């Protein structure tokens, strides 16, 4: 695997592949990789001739009091994991390469509506930062397909919407959430959990499972949400939000919506954990 922070080197290699009629898959990450990221790389290998990944801790998507400085940087370990998984090209830019004029003078991308709720309401400007960096990386790499984890369900829909609205010529693939044996969704932020908190963190997925079963059995959505929130508080969480939405639009569900998604964000110790579950009723 070749690692570079130089935009022109990425473009030159991709052009060579394309000149040979070969396809390119892209997996953008913020590093500190876990099994979920490696699953994305392996799926990417099934969908294209070549796999490109990026590692960039994007300052534009972090709020003033969030964990930008504390976010783990583990480049050597990440390079080894990506190489073993079959990634061929790794882009590792610095903020001054991505945002040479600084964040305040940077052109940005905003996906209205879907970016403003749930995580967007809790983290103002977050999805502006996500959409901007993802579009910039797409312009640099020019992939045929890009892969994202379904754990970040709202992010996936924001990116799909951006790609559709801007007529970008690539496919967006959502890959199923990879979980630990307890059911906890794998996340780079799980490293913030103490051993005791990690044991209790499985209650998040359990609450989503119970809520989906209740709604499927006919329980009113509001009543099921109230019970799930109570279960999270009992387990030691501080819920940020727990909501049921249309699985396709993230709009509040109507009686006609049969495919639903429950989305949750909750604090446990220093960690803000998110998870979701798509279900039918």
UniProtKB/Swiss-Prot annotation:
Its main location: cytoplasm. Beta-alanine binds at residue 61. Signal peptide: none annotated. The active site is at residue 37. GO terms for cellular component: cytosol. It is an enzyme of class 6 (ligase). It catalyses: (R)-pantoate + beta-alanine + ATP = (R)-pantothenate + AMP + diphosphate + H(+). (R)-pantoate binds at residues 61, 155. Pathway: Cofactor biosynthesis; (R)-pantothenate biosynthesis; (R)-pantothenate from (R)-pantoate and beta-alanine: step 1/1. ATP binds at residues 30-37, 149-152, 178, 186-189. It is found in: Cytoplasm. Its EC number is 6.3.2.1. Keywords: ATP-binding, Cytoplasm, Ligase, Nucleotide-binding, Pantothenate biosynthesis. One of its GO terms (biological process) is pantothenate biosynthetic process. GO terms for molecular function: ATP binding; pantoate-beta-alanine ligase activity. InterPro entries: Cyt_trans-like, Pantoate_ligase, Pantoate_ligase_C, Rossmann-like_a/b/a_fold. Homodimer. Belongs to the pantothenate synthetase family. Catalyzes the condensation of pantoate with beta-alanine in an ATP-dependent reaction via a pantoyl-adenylate intermediate. The reaction proceeds by a bi uni uni bi ping pong mechanism. PANTHER family: CYTIDYLATE KINASE/PANTOATE-BETA-ALANINE LIGASE, PANTOATE--BETA-ALANINE LIGASE. This is Pantothenate synthetase. It comes from Shewanella amazonensis (strain ATCC BAA-1098 / SB2B). The lineage of its organism: Bacteria, Pseudomonadati, Pseudomonadota, Gammaproteobacteria, Alteromonadales.
């Amino acid at each position: 695997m070749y690692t570079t922070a130089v935009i022109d080197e990425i473009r030159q290699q991709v052009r060579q592949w394309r000149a040979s009629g070969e396809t390119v898959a892209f997996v953008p990450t913020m590093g500190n990789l876990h099994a979920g990221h490696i699953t994305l790389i392996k799926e990417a290998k099934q969908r294209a001739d070549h796999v490109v990944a990026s590692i960039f801790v994007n300052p534009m998507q972090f709020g003033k009091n969030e964990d930008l400085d504390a976010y783990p940087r583990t480049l050597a370990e990440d390079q080894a994991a990506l190489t073993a998984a079959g990634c061929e090209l790794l882009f590792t830019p610095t903020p001054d390469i991505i945002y040479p004029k600084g964040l305040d003078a940077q052109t940005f991308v905003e996906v209205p509506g879907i970016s403003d709720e749930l995580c967007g309401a809790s983290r103002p400007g977050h999805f502006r930062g996500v959409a901007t960096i993802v579009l910039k990386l797409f312009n640099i790499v020019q992939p045929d397909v890009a892969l994202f984890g379904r754990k970040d369900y709202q992010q996936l829909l924001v990116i799909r919407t951006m790609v559709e609205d801007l007529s970008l010529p690539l496919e967006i693939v959502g890959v199923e959430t990879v979980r630990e044996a307890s059911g906890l969704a794998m996340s780079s932020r799980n490293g913030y959990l103490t051993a005791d908190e990690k044991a209790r963190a499985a209650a998040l997925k359990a609450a989503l499972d119970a809520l989906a079963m209740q709604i499927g059995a006919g329980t009113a959505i509001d009543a099921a949400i109230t019970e799930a929130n109570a279960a999270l508080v009992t387990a030691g969480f501080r819920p940020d939000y727990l909501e049921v939405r249309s699985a396709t639009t993230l709009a509040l569900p109507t009686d006609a919506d049969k495919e639903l998604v429950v989305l949750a964000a909750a604090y446990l110790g220093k960690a803000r954990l998110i998870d979701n579950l798509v279900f039918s009723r």
